[in-house]
Amino acid sequence: MPESTAWVLALDPQLLAAVGEREMVHLVEMPTLLEVPRSPPYCRQVLVWNDTVLPAMDLAAWLRGQPAQRQQTLAGVFAYQARPGADPEYGALLLAGIPTRTRVADNQACALPKQPGNWQTLAISCFRQSDQPIPILDLPHIFTGGLL
């Protein structure tokens, strides 16, 4: 059975999501985040990375409707293509822990979690690991205004 490699991300202490192995390009352990006035609660900050200002999305805040409580904040930098053949673009996600790599097989596919709601807006698929569903994030949708 074919397998793929994914990064499992802790969005907060309870929420997990995943991205493809090649989508995460950098992890910033103690990010300097700059506040953006009058921005939505799930995207209140930006991260300067490689001389580029990236939105720092808090997907846990978007899903739960309030900012996530984290013991530590990390920022993952992710690459995505807005459309096929386009140059890669980058965005940041706020994380609650260091991502872990995992192997995923087709027979692990499952339905998206029912709670919190709105996973269908963020995710393109889902797999089960240790009896927990882990949604696979749709990064182009997330970073190109799909959450507005």
Regions found by a protein language model. Give the residues of each.
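An acidic, low-aromatic, low-complexity terminal/linker signal
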Residues: 1-148
